[in-house]
């Protein structure tokens, strides 16, 4: 709004989304005036709100007392921030594990040609409702690069993919599952399961348990993914795909917890466009969620 920055937060007063909602407008202009890419996560006690600010890259995380928001009271909020130099967009995993730290995840950025990145950065928020602080760990991963903007049938306009930033991640069963799009020659969805090893409270550090890419074949790009994981460790990824001979489609893939490591099952088409998208924007708020009633 003009030169001001706000988070808009809405919380239902019970499990019925058709009922009443408690709505908040949180002014963060004092941090910076050009908020972008808001993200949200929750755990047992805290609602976490994160966003990018671009003068220069910097990141703000608000820690909101969940009990206030559930009953519509004035919010008790603490905050922590960090510089974005060399890293991009804080992914905030929804936290299903009780008594677990809140983690965040960032991809690399900043090289002149946007290629040959080989790590991602993990953060843990300590004491979120007191005096919050953050500790980090850099995890080595297979090399990745900025994604190529994908072709689509019927137009020269290509959806803008930004960077290999993390918009979607889940914390469940002691792991963080995260997805982004990578590859400077043909964009592909990449996914990771990161075993957090109880970090930072343990003497161990996070380990890459498994990873993979969703490759739909020659000339087909996959991009803007979102991921969901259920209580049994089954996972699903929703994403877009297109090529010079395909309109943009919405697709999904799934894996069972006992499937071979690093593999998802064949993709399914959910919906296919019947004409090209010409605005230049597509899918950056893709979302996926596990059913609350059925696992698997």
Where are these regions (language model features)?
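C-terminal PAP-associated
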Residues: 1-296
């Amino acid at each position: 709004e003009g030169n001001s920055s706000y988070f808009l937060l809405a919380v239902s007063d019970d499990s019925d989304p058709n009922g009443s909602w408690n709505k908040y407008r949180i002014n963060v202009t004092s941090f910076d005036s050009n908020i972008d890419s808001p993200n949200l996560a929750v755990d047992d006690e805290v609602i976490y709100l994160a966003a990018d600010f671009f003068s220069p890259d910097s990141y703000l995380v608000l820690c909101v007392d969940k009990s206030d928001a559930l009953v519509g009271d004035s919010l008790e909020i603490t905050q922590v921030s960090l510089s974005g130099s060399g890293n991009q967009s804080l992914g905030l995993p929804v936290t299903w594990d009780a008594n677990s730290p809140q983690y965040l995840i960032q991809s690399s950025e900043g090289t002149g040609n946007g290629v040959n990145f080989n790590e991602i950065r993990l953060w843990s928020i300590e004491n979120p409702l007191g005096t919050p602080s953050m500790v980090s760990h850099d995890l080595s991963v297979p090399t990745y690069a900025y994604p190529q903007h994908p072709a689509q049938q019927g137009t020269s306009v290509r959806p803008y993919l930004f960077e290999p930033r993390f918009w979607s991640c889940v914390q469940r069963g002691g792991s963080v599952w995260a997805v982004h799009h990578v590859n400077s020659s043909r964009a592909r969805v990449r996914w990771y399961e990161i075993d957090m090893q109880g970090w930072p409270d343990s003497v161990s550090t996070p380990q890459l348990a498994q990873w993979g890419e969703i490759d739909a074949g020659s000339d087909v790009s996959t991009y803007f993914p979102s991921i969901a994981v259920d209580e049994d460790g089954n996972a699903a990824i929703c994403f877009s795909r297109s090529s010079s001979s395909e309109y943009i489609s919405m697709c999904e893939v799934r894996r069972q917890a006992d499937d071979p490591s690093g593999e998802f099952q064949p993709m399914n088409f959910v919906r296919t466009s019947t004409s090209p998208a010409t605005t230049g924007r597509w899918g950056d708020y893709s979302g996926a969620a596990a059913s609350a009633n059925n696992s698997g």
